[in-house]
Amino acid sequence: MRYSRLFGKTQREIPSDAETISHQLLLRSGMIAQLTAGVYSFMPLAWRSIQKIENIIRQEMNKSGCQELAMPVLQPVEIWQQSGREAPFGQTLFHLKDRKDRNLVLGPTHEEVITDLASRYIQSYRDLPQRLYQIQTKFRDEPRPRGGLIRVREFIMKDMYSFDASPEGLDESYQTMKQAYENVYRRCGLESMVIDADSGAIGGKASHEFMIVAESGEDSIIYCPKCNYAANAEKAVFKKKTLPKEPPKDLEEVATPGQKTISEVAAFLSLKPENTLKAVFYMADGKFVMAVIRGDLDINEIKLKNLLKCNDLRLAEDSEVKAAGIAAGFASPVGLKNSLTVADDSVENGSNFVAGANKDGFHLKNVNFGRDFKADKMADIALAAEGAACPFCDGTFASKRGVEVGHIFKLGTFLSERFGANFTDAEGISHPIIMGCYGMGVGRLLAAAIEQNHDEKGIIWPMPIAPYQIYICGLFLDNPAVSQAAEKIYTELEAQGVEVLFDDRELTAGVKFNDADLLGIPLRLTISPRNLDKGGVELKLRRNKESELVPLESIMERVITCIKSQSDL
């Protein structure tokens, strides 16, 4: 491909609304173009990379015994009502009506459609197992699209669904897909981690996320370096600090003027944060909820939402807290009425805590769970953090940032029961089909690759998913020797099947080198009068600072060797 014919242009300035590195570089390199919030066009360079990612995915899916199909994006809302997932997805669903006033949605995922198909075409144990997948555009009305391709409203996704006759069959399908996903990321040249995850609105009994490790990632990964336990911070469990038990003392009100935060109160009263309690207020499906936790811990809102089994959970607004008769900054679980109280199990681990007095400028000393307040629900609702104790060994948690690029779930019979997707066994007895679902974000994977592979100059594409394998930079192309050598090398490389982007533009060396670094093509071949006078051309790997002079007669062999060494992942 000649650069002079390439559709799209690079930008020097960093777009003001681009927060993540991948968003900045995708826009600056002219690889994507925004149409509206969370909706992008893939320009030719990015689309070449997308196609390569999809090809790797297809190869691994097909190798794992999967069959590709295509399902409709337009779905009747009734199937979402039948599954019971219309409410959990809530405003994320794009709703529309057709000309006959029928309610439809744009598919954010396809569990409902595939289960409906299974109910029609799987009748016997002889029809099992089945593994079906598609690569298709999906739609989710994200409240805050951000991060370029990281969180969008229209996106490309590979979704696969497994159907088995037994839990053991599901386990086999699940492990097969887990390995296939790891193969995809490895072949794309990316470092990934498999971690325990929350199932969210998809549902199911177990799930794992696949994270591409990147400092700018939006997800927090909690892991134990000693035993290799790893989980999303939303899901992670940990060993909470044990406090000594003391005999309960009498409640005592103390003045704490202007001391509203846990750290302020602890310092003022010469306590440690773990000797305090804090109350956080939420609205859960419109119902007022107080969550109580030890002062050294934070609320995990995903755990809380799962415990309450609510579709919508948000922090209560100041007006809602005030209407409940609560003094903000001095809130107390003691004596509070007309609210659902949820306590983290840490409140049982300790005694004589300090908590708010629900009175401006005052706190209560010697607050004890059971005597002074009770909970309607008690569970682990604490957020794991770096430095927490691992519950599976004597290690201590560390943390990394990552971008989620895949999520797999053991659905079980959750959906098959609702859709009547049953099979008869060898004895003629009917059973619900046991399902799994497996999602992989293709656009997210593209963005994550950049988050993991870049420097201050631009993108550094892994060879397997680079738009082109080599960038030919012709300098002083008005020089006949340079233009002839460049054209000859370009033609011969293409004839060998090498993917070449030939910068044939009449621009300065500085502009061409800057664009080469920004676009991140893995190899750069520079043809200039000075190099030709030395009997060769300059070859440089984008990932390295050093370059080498390659004799003209050795170019083909050297380039192909470099491509192969960078592709064998």
Curated annotation (Swiss-Prot):
Q: What is its main location?
A: cytoplasm
* GO BP: prolyl-tRNA aminoacylation
Q: Where in the cell is it found?
A: Cytoplasm
A GO CC term assigned to this protein in UniProt: cytosol
EC number assigned by the record = 6.1.1.15
Is-annotated flag, keyword Lipid biosynthesis? no
Q: Does the keyword Transmembrane apply?
A: no
* InterPro entries attached to this UniProt entry: aa-tRNA-synt_IIb, aa-tRNA-synth_II, aa-tRNA-synth_II/BPL/LPL, Anticodon-bd, Anticodon-bd_dom_sf, Pro-tRNA-ligase_IIa, Pro-tRNA-synth_IIa_bac-type, Pro-tRNA-Synthase_IIa_type1
Question: A GO molecular function for this record?
Answer: aminoacyl-tRNA deacylase activity
Q: Give the domain of life.
A: Bacteria
Tell me which UniProt keywords the record has, alphabetically: Aminoacyl-tRNA synthetase, ATP-binding, Cytoplasm, Ligase, Nucleotide-binding, Protein biosynthesis
CDD domains, A to Z: ProRS-INS (cd04334), ProRS_anticodon_short (cd00861), ProRS_core_prok (cd00779)
Catalytic activity, reaction form = tRNA(Pro) + L-proline + ATP = L-prolyl-tRNA(Pro) + AMP + diphosphate
Subunit record text: Homodimer.
- Function field: Catalyzes the attachment of proline to tRNA(Pro) in a two-step reaction: proline is first activated by ATP to form Pro-AMP and then transferred to the acceptor end of tRNA(Pro). As ProRS can inadvertently accommodate and process non-cognate amino acids such as alanine and cysteine, to avoid such errors it has two additional distinct editing activities against alanine. One activity is designated as 'pretransfer' editing and involves the tRNA(Pro)-independent hydrolysis of activated Ala-AMP.
Record remark: domains: Consists of three domains: the N-terminal catalytic domain, the editing domain and the C-terminal anticodon-binding domain.
State the family named in the UniProt similarity comment for this chain.
Belongs to the class-II aminoacyl-tRNA synthetase family. ProS type 1 subfamily.
By what name is this protein known?
Answer: Proline--tRNA ligase
Q: Which organism is it from?
A: Dehalococcoides mccartyi (strain ATCC BAA-2266 / KCTC 15142 / 195)
Organism lineage: Bacteria, Bacillati, Chloroflexota, Dehalococcoidia, Dehalococcoidales
